[in-house]
């Protein structure tokens, strides 16, 4: 189990979250610690699994994927498939970016991206609803994303 992060580790994570490509020298100046310390701390955070990967944040509008929708799904237990098996099939659908098993009235929560609402509809009608184990669905198209973190 990794130790609790100190203030420097938290600041370093915040800087890397804002720009994973930030170089060691710049991070050293921003944090007020030696470059070797920055390098060591990043390496330790990776080894301890606190940092799983360094990634990018795409501009989905420029990729013609500017429409985001959240879809709630009721699992059909009479399908002969487990809820996890249904979730794994859903995860393979192009345009599905997140699949969550959730508690409450609904069983799964999806985040879907497409070029427009019509394309979201095609994903729901032609792909999702064809999967055995998918019961009722509710689709909510996002007007605007106020905050989205990686």
Curated annotation (Swiss-Prot):
Which residues belong to any copy of the HTH asnC-type domain?
5-66
What are the record's GO terms for cellular component?
cytosol
Q: Which InterPro entries match?
A: ArsR-like_HTH, AsnC-type_HTH_dom, Dimeric_a/b-barrel, Tscrpt_reg_AsnC-like, Tscrpt_reg_AsnC/Lrp_C, WH-like_DNA-bd_sf, WH_DNA-bd_sf
DNA-binding region(s): which residue ranges? 24-43
Lineage of producing organism? Archaea, Methanobacteriati, Methanobacteriota, Thermococci, Thermococcales
A GO term for molecular function: sequence-specific DNA binding
The parts of the chain that form a coiled coil are: none
Q: Which UniProt keywords apply?
A: DNA-binding, Transcription, Transcription regulation
Output the superkingdom of the source species: Archaea
Q: Name one GO biological process term.
A: response to amino acid
Protein name stated in the entry: Uncharacterized HTH-type transcriptional regulator PH1916
């Amino acid at each position: 189990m990794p130790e609790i992060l100190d203030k420097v580790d938290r600041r370093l994570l915040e800087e890397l979250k804002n720009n994973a490509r930030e170089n060691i020298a710049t991070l050293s100046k921003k944090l007020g610690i030696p470059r070797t310390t920055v390098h060591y701390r990043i390496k330790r955070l990776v080894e301890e699994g606190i940092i799983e990967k360094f990634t990018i944040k795409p501009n989905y509008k420029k990729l013609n994927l500017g429409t985001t929708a959240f879809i709630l799904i009721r699992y059909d237990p009479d399908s002969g498939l487990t809820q996890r098996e249904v979730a794994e099939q859903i995860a393979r659908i192009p345009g599905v970016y997140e699949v969550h098993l959730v508690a409450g009235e609904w069983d799964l929560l999806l985040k879907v991206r497409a070029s427009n609402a019509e394309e979201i509809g095609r994903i729901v009608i032609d792909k999702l609803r064809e999967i055995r184990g998918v019961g009722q669905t509710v689709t909510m198209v996002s007007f605007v994303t106020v905050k989205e973190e990686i």
